[in-house]
């Protein structure tokens, strides 16, 4: 469920900068 939400955010963001930021946060959580 959480992973689907992250992918949804990545899709909504669309920008590589936001994608990198979300990826960094996601890696920090896991």
From Swiss-Prot:
* Keywords attached to this entry: Amidation, Antibiotic, Antimicrobial, Disulfide bond, Secreted
Q: Which GO terms describe its biological process?
A: defense response to bacterium
Q: Which residues carry this modification: Threonine amide?
A: 30
Keyword Secreted found: yes
Which residue spans traverse the membrane?
none
Q: Name one GO cellular component term.
A: extracellular region
Where, per UniProt, does this protein localize?
Secreted
Instruction: Please tell me whether the keyword rRNA-binding is annotated for this protein.
Output: no
* Signal sequence segment: none
How does it associate, per the subunit comment?
Homodimer.
The entry's function note states: Shows antibacterial activity against both Gram-positive and Gram-negative bacteria. Its antimicrobial activity is optimal at NaCl concentrations below 100 mM, suggesting that the antimicrobial actions of this peptide may take place intracellularly rather than extracellularly. Has no activity against the fungus C.albicans. Has modest hemolytic activity.
Name of the molecule in the record: Dicynthaurin
């Amino acid at each position: 469920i959480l992973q689907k939400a992250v992918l949804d955010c990545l899709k909504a963001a669309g920008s590589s900068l936001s994608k990198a930021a979300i990826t960094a946060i996601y890696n920090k959580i896991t």
